[in-house]
Amino acid sequence: LWLLQSCSGVGTQSDFQELPEAGWPLRTPVRFSLSVKDSLLDQSLWIALRHDQDYPFSNIFLITTLSHPNGSVITDTLSYDLAAADGQWLGSGNGIITHQLPFKKGVSFDSTKPYELSIYQAVRSLGSQEGMAFLPGVLSVGYLLEKTTSNPK
């Protein structure tokens, strides 16, 4: 059982989406609506990733867009190591590996209206300039939003 399955506790919010068995399609984002309950608290936003032993790489490249309710958009290109140099997965689990990847730490969301988060895979095979049409082995992608302080600004 994956603990980040759409739970909501004090200061914590999370959700995830399952991906097709054929793999995560290139240019197909996983989209989430983030409801910020308190715009005065610093919060951290994590990307949650689950994959099986068939995931063929030791890292992953992601492109994210975070859309503010006022219409502004922040786009980031991210690179995460998923395995150590010896091939051991860095996440937790045995058959299914879960990673909690840092995305935005200690940030203030200045609106309680919904933010939109989109996550795309941007993985390429070695020597290829084109992204993989379908990224195998990734089972689900999600996010975790948690408060990092209990003191309002």
Feature map (PLM): residue ranges:
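A beta-strand/beta-hairpin structural motif
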Residues: 80-82, 90-107
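C-terminal motif of bacterial Sec signal peptides marking the signal peptidase cleavage site
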Residues: 3-6
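Post-signal peptide N-terminal segment of mature Sec-exported envelope proteins
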Residues: 15-37
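Contiguous beta-strand segments within globular domains
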Residues: 30-49, 57-58
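Exposed low-complexity, polar/acidic, P/S/T/G-rich flexible segments that act as propeptides
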Residues: 62, 66-67, 125-153
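Short acidic/polar inter-strand loop motif in beta-rich domains
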Residues: 52-54, 98-109, 120-134
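Noncatalytic modules at the cell exterior or secretory-pathway interfaces
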Residues: 39-47, 107-126
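Bacterial signal peptide processing site
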Residues: 8-11
